[in-house]
């Protein structure tokens, strides 16, 4: 699945949102915490654990793990604390605990930035100095859910692969083991 001009995250976010609205239970397999913002009644995260296994994360797990009111606040959390894996700068000197405290106090990054007069001392200075980085991080952390693409359930049904097309692709990519495993032969086409 792809849509020209859009990131894969945004396509996944849009399709997960559409599936949720249709009442279809959907799992997103990813270790990326920014996908937590997409979790909804019918959308869960299937997160690989270090060392093996998986955790299934729903709304309650996000709220408990991060101490926030809604999964959508993952965006606010990342905007403040940053994310080195995804290159979100955040607000220097603000870690997860402080970010959660600020989100719970102000409700959102937007409210925080409108209410910096309520901050004191070093925290006020940190937020004021990092306003643009916080806004950029918020933008970067937000996974779009409005990509012009439709959830086509018929197209997503599992079908037997076209052996000839698959053989050509595996040959082009030099996937000899997969050719043998899925096509039962190691010969080239």
Where are these predicted regions, by residue range?
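Extended two-metal-dependent nuclease catalytic cores across DNA- and RNA-processing enzymes
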Residues: 1-150
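Low-complexity, acidic/Ser/Thr- and charged residue-rich accessory regions of DNA metabolism proteins
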Residues: 129, 139-189
């Amino acid at each position: 699945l792809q849509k020209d001009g859009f990131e894969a995250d945004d396509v996944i976010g849009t399709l997960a949102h559409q599936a949720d609205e249709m009442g279809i239970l959907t799992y997103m397999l990813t270790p990326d915490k920014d996908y937590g913002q997409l979790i909804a009644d019918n959308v869960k995260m299937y997160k690989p654990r270090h060392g093996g296994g998986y955790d299934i994360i729903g709304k309650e797990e996000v709220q408990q793990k991060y101490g926030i009111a809604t999964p959508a606040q993952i965006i606010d959390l990342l905007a403040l604390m940053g994310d080195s894996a995804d290159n979100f700068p955040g607000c220097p000197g603000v870690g997860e605990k402080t970010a959660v405290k600020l989100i719970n106090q102000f409700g959102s990054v937007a409210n925080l930035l409108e209410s910096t007069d309520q901050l004191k001392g070093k925290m006020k200075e940190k937020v004021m100095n990092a306003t643009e980085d916080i806004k950029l991080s918020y933008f970067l952390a937000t996974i779009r859910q409005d990509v012009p693409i439709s959830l086509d359930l018929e197209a997503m049904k599992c079908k037997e692969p076209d052996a000839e097309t698959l053989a050509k692709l595996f040959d082009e990519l030099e996937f000899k083991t997969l050719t043998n495993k899925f096509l039962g032969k190691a010969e080239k086409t």
